[in-house]
Amino acid sequence: MSLFDKICRALIKMIRKKPEYKKLWQNASPTSTFNPQALSLDGLAVKGVDGVRILTKRNSSDTDGALYITDIPLNEFSGKEIAGEAMFITGAYGKIYGYYRYFNIPKDRKTINISHGYDTSPSADVQANNHVVPVAIYSIVNGFKNGLWGGVLRNLLQPFVRGCFV
């Protein structure tokens, strides 16, 4: 097998690697308001985990089953980094108002801090813990492999690799 073939096979293996998700936490009462809390999630500190997926619903009383997804890369933060911690916002939008809640993962990855929920009105943000209610949290393996540049590299190389076998 030539060096070129080996490179092509390695690139294909990298591109085809699918993310794996493992449930770390589930809200026992997603139809109730969700107050701020720090969840202990030792599963985030496991070697190989490179991200976290948070599923939320717009409102604790929603019955339509719609979930909103927030993926947070843990190796290279793409959100704000404040006081050594990565902070991300997720939100769902109603007819007039927007809703949001902060998710903060310290660098030790042993907890996830969840803020109050907020309802944005035309005049100000109003605390509303029945909005953006977390439903489940998953660890992600291979979801952000090699960080942002790994994903960019994969996207750039896909046409080339496909051409290897044409």
Where are these regions (language model features)?
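Terminal beta-strand-rich extracellular "head" domains
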Residues: N59, A66-I69, P73-G98
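Surface-exposed ligand/attachment interfaces on beta-rich extracellular proteins
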Residues: N27-K47, N59-I69, E76
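Trp- and acidic/polar-enriched beta-sheet ligand-binding modules for extracellular glycan
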Residues: W25-T33, L55, E85-I89, S115
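Extracellular jelly-roll beta-sandwich "head" domains, especially the C-terminal globular C1q domain
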Residues: T90-V166
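Glycine-rich, low-complexity segments
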Residues: K6-F34, G43-L44, N142-L157
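A short beta-strand element within beta-rich, extracytoplasmic domains
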Residues: D50-R58, I112-Y118
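Residues marking helix boundaries in flexible regions
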Residues: C8, K13-R16, T70-P73, A83, ...
